[in-house]
Amino acid sequence: MLNQNNQELFKPSKEFSRNARIKNLCEYYDLCDEAKEDFEGFWKRQALEKIEWFSPFSRVLNEDKAPFYKWFEGGTLNVSYQCLDRHMKTRRNKAALIFEGEMGDYEVYTYRRLLHETCKAANLLKKFGVKKGDRVVIYMPMIPETAIVMLACARIGAIHSVVFGGFSPEALRDRIIDAGAKLVVTADGAFRRGKPYMLKPAVDKALSEGCESVEKVLIVIRNNEPIEYIKGRDYVYNELVKNESYKCEPEIMDSEDLLFLLYTSGSTGKPKGVMHASAGYILWAQMTMEWVFDIKDYDNYWCSADVGWITGHTYVVYGPLACGATTIMHEGTPTYPNSGRWWRMIEEYQISKFYTSPTAIRMLHADAPDEPRKYDLSTLEVLGTVGEPINPSAWKWFYDEIGGTKSPIVDTWWQTETGGHMITPLPGATPLKPGCATLPLPGIFAEVIDEEGNKKDEGEDGLLCITKPWPSMIRGIWGNDERYIESYFSQAKKDGKAVYFSGDGAFYDKNGYITITGRTDDVVNVAGHRIGTAEIESAIAKHPSVAESAVVSILDAIKGESLFAFVVLSPASSCDLGGAIETLKELNDILRVEIGPIAKIEKILYTPGLPKTRSGKIMRRILRTIARGEEIKQDISTLEDSGVVETIVKLAKAEFE
């Protein structure tokens, strides 16, 4: 069965395109052709134009030890200098970071102030013995000090590893041990849904179970709740940093010196420490901010991601600051104190570029679909989505209600390992298609191929691979070269050479666009027909009573696999829990129209929620285990709400046993 994406195209407005950095598809293809005809020349030009080098690079790309690629060898720079110092001549009094806390507190950091605070933090880190190459684990909430400590590490050449503040002590411990961290920076706690929550006790528990490499712990006081202090190990950041000098010369860093480690989450076994290097990463962070969000000097830009994820690294901290933008940081949740929180912030801060997740969009749509109409959202110029494929109905609501049909949506595909956007529309150039990432960015050779490198025809399932290296790519897995090769360069080849496999499946549509079908382990095989769960879930979302769903496979004696749907009903749903059979028929009617008769749900279970990682990704492996009646062996400690798993297990037993 061939895949299709027959959604209508939405062309960029002529007014927006007129002033965009990339104004039309001709300009886009010109850049693509430049990269194709002179690959190294293309990247050399970008690097010379964008980065303020301390000393020039002598070699653009070193492929001698592929897939351990090296970029811009011989060049020296400092990422904090690129993000802060170089703006002092023209933007020193411009807002660099605007923070709004969960409880409504508010703070503005100009570029000058952010530089001074970064230097003070850098000097404090040095007093604690942190030097170039040392690892610093940051276990923090969404507060300005998190970004400041990241930049301070970059300034002195320390390698930071941010661990999301919602991870368990066990997950934190594993990452500290793997990185060999010398210092941990944390907070007493923060605020969520109007109430304080704690972080420091998790650090205490993690460090009580090993972590011999850790010498000291710095604690940022945020919520002022009582915490335990261990003498000689724990120190209060707020008290010490104010006494430091606001001057700190940036460390001279080689292009390939590591900037940070970021551990991939949600998987079993030892975490993978993804390594990113200084020059290539910051170059692509800046380029994608300028191209994909069409960042201008007047923009107030807001990415709602947590800094604990790669999206927060690249598109809350490093990318916006590298190009001199104003970045918004929000501590809380989108529905506290009500579902208008985000829309009020967009109105109040006059946000022009807004980047969030499909999960958040679906949640706000289901919770209060008319709430955005109470606010003036007219300042919005570009909307963006990240983290998972967005179903067309959520896309349309986002486009109509939030963007007022005038703001293009950049549906971005990328990964922790890629460092920045790979496949995405350009807001002034690319005709948009709901639920479709569209085209690779110039310089990115993303292709849908088979294991031997043959390009797939329209509608055929294939492996989404990147067949040439790029500057911001993963440099390896910390301490495990073999795992790096096995994880990313062992599944596909092109012209006899191993290429990067993303782990995602995809297909080309009739426009030549790439549609992501989801992780290759999120593909079900029904009677020999491979169907992406994202496609099924997008169709299910068209039912007016469905707020969210997750589809997994169960074993079928006849078909091999059949479909099991976990469905979360919208608050305004007319369905009742006794009407599952009726709803099942309605959903299958939709699937028959949207996909075909092969896509038929055999079992349905209404649930109050779905198990998700802290970054909003649905953990389908856990749901598959439940649907098949198997024992759960996956780690659920890193879930947003681990209690929902127990609830679903009970519901499944009551319904099907």
Curated annotation (Swiss-Prot):
GO CC, any one term: cytosol
Positions contributing to Mg(2+) binding: 543, 546
EC number: 6.2.1.1
TM regions (residue ranges): none
UniProt keyword list: Acetylation, ATP-binding, Ligase, Magnesium, Metal-binding, Nucleotide-binding
Reactions the enzyme catalyzes: acetate + ATP + CoA = acetyl-CoA + AMP + diphosphate
A Gene Ontology BP annotation from the UniProt entry: acetyl-CoA biosynthetic process from acetate
Function, in words: Catalyzes the conversion of acetate into acetyl-CoA (AcCoA), an essential intermediate at the junction of anabolic and catabolic pathways. AcsA undergoes a two-step reaction. In the first half reaction, AcsA combines acetate with ATP to form acetyl-adenylate (AcAMP) intermediate. In the second half reaction, it can then transfer the acetyl group from AcAMP to the sulfhydryl group of CoA, forming the product AcCoA.
Similarity comment: Belongs to the ATP-dependent AMP-binding enzyme family.
Name used for this protein in its record: Acetyl-coenzyme A synthetase
This protein's encoding gene: acsA
